[in-house]
Amino acid sequence: MKKIEIKSVNISEKKGTIKVPVDVIELCETGVKGDAHAGAWHRMVSLLAVESIEKFEHKSKRKIAYGEFAENITTQGVLLYTHPLDRFEGKGIELEVTQIGKECHGDGCAIFREVGNCVMPKEGIFARVIKGGKLKAGDTLEYKPRVHKIHVITLSDRAFAGEYEDLRGPAIE
């Protein structure tokens, strides 16, 4: 499994502002305890990969601090936006990706006001908390891809009518 290193954990008390790195965050059933975006919705926790931040820094020719894109968790090791519906687990914590990207708030976003662009609409991800716990910089999460079980059903009117026995494939168990 792929390991994801936590580079920073960040909180803001008000929406539309840059998040501030803190020593530890507590993930609970509504998201990050004490964060403005916590609540009973599908975007409880925001994550952004250092790889995405570095790409933005190169394009904007500006250094970006952790939390500046208002992400709760800054990670390294996996391009997060390529993993819809997957899970990240570690230290008893379990997060499930619920959304990739978001609508840009334009002037309602601190980084957009300053730079004129933002990475979150395309590469930021959002997750819900399945199992909570404490998380800090230096911790690791394990990437767990969602396994999709697929069954193919072949229907035959002639076999159903008893004209012949359909032997095309095994029965689904």
Q: What is each PLM-predicted segment?
A:
Residues H148-E173:
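Glycine-rich phosphate/diphosphate-binding loop of Rossmann-like nucleotide-binding domains
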